[in-house]
Design a protein with these regions (language model features):
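Generic detector of intrinsically disordered, low-complexity, polar/charged segments
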Residues: 1, 20-22, 46, 65, ...
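Bacterial Sec-dependent N-terminal signal peptides
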Residues: 1-50
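Short, low-complexity intrinsically disordered segments
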Residues: 2-3, 147, 173, 188, ...
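Short beta-strand element of the conserved SAM-dependent methyltransferase core
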Residues: 6, 17, 57, 166-168
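Glycine-centered flexibility motif
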Residues: 14, 21, 88-89, 194-197
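Extracellular or lumenal secretory-pathway regions
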Residues: 44-148, 152-155, 162, 176, ...
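Glycine- and acidic-residue-rich phosphate-binding/metal-coordinating active-site segment common to enzymes
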Residues: 153-158, 162-219
């Protein structure tokens, strides 16, 4: 492992960002490469299919900040499909898989907006979701339910595609969508799908959540399923050790209830870790990095600590 770390540092040091790394009250000046790239290199991953295309969506969530002021949070997600399996996940992860490596700071939006990685029909007849919520990574399982769509008369042109409208109620929210039969794929963003064409836009009836097709790429890309990650963490003596980080498995309904309890609490927007131990007390270290906008991001074993939370707006109510 020591030789592997030396090779990684020498090959990737040109991409490093330097930051003070705190370990049990002490400060060390280290290259971020030592730990931010370990997810990609040491994750236990399976290729469960090869997608022939990737659909990119812009997701917007209308909410309020800690002062109660209205804000709209945006992020992008990628959707792949192969042999009945669909993966919907943050665009940054898709981009990292194509380019190699990993930047924890790029995962901040997914953590702030509580957008997980969703495998539809994997395993067969089930939906598997992987999501970070400090201090753990969670994996949930639920039945794959048929979405009963009602086709309506609306027509529009979205991202250059002729589209028709439809509506359904799913997990407590009513969704109004447009889809195009020009792309004969029965998929869409997040957990939505089952129409006779690609979903190009989806908005809940309250106007809080909106997914809009942003791009469509015909390309062969592997659909990756991550079982667990092995993280490199400091031992407090200036050296590193490896730590296997498993997902905490829960029923989807139990995790949804837990998120409502934790994220729906009024204290969350003022103190986003109120419900968990202080990271320095519990883990003895905090990783620091910067996202592309220059904002500092803190994490523990790759799990992002949200520093600027907004009011939680669930994508499903039950």
């Amino acid at each position: 492992m020591e030789n592997w770390m030396k090779r990684m540092k020498s090959k990737l040091v040109c991409f490093a960002e330097h930051e003070i790394f705190r370990v049990k009250g002490k400060k060390f000046l280290l290259t971020m490469v030592a730990f931010v790239l370990t997810v990609a290199a040491l994750a236990q991953r399976d290729t469960i299919g090869v997608s022939k295309f990737t659909a990119i969506y812009r997701y917007e969530c209308k909410t309020t900040d800690a002062d109660g002021q209205p804000v709209t949070d945006p992020m992008y997600i990628a959707v792949q499909t192969s042999s009945g399996v669909t993966k919907s996940f943050p665009y940054e992860e898709y981009d990292r898989q194509k380019k190699g490596g990993s930047r924890i700071a790029d995962s901040y939006l997914a953590a702030q907006m509580h957008m997980g990685t969703i495998f539809t029909n994997y395993p067969e007849g089930r939906i598997t979701t992987q999501e970070m919520l400090y201090p753990y990574r969670y994996m949930t399982d639920e039945p794959l339910e048929k979405q009963n769509w009602t086709l309506t008369d609306g027509q529009d042109s979205i991202s250059g595609y002729a589209c028709q409208s439809a509506t359904t109620k799913y997990h407590g929210l009513t969704w109004n969508v447009y889809y195009t039969e020009e792309v004969p794929a029965t998929i869409g963003p997040w957990k939505l799908g089952g129409l006779p064409g690609l979903i190009t836009k989806a908005t809940d009836a309250n106007g809080i959540h909106t997914f809009t097709l942003y791009g469509f790429h015909q390309e062969d890309t592997p659909i990756i399923y991550t079982k667990y990650v092995t993280w490199i963490v400091p031992d407090g003596q200036g050296k590193f050790t490896t730590q296997r980080v498993d997902y905490q498995e829960m029923k989807a309904s139990d995790f949804l209830a837990y998120k409502k309890k934790v994220l729906g609490n009024s204290r969350y927007v003022k103190n986003p870790t109120y419900y968990a131990p202080d990271p320095m007390t519990a883990f003895g270290y905090v990783e620091k990095s910067y996202n592309p906008t220059g904002n500092q991001v803190s994490s523990v074993a790759g799990v992002v600590i949200v520093s600027n939370p907004h009011q939680y707006q669930p994508l499903e109510l039950k």
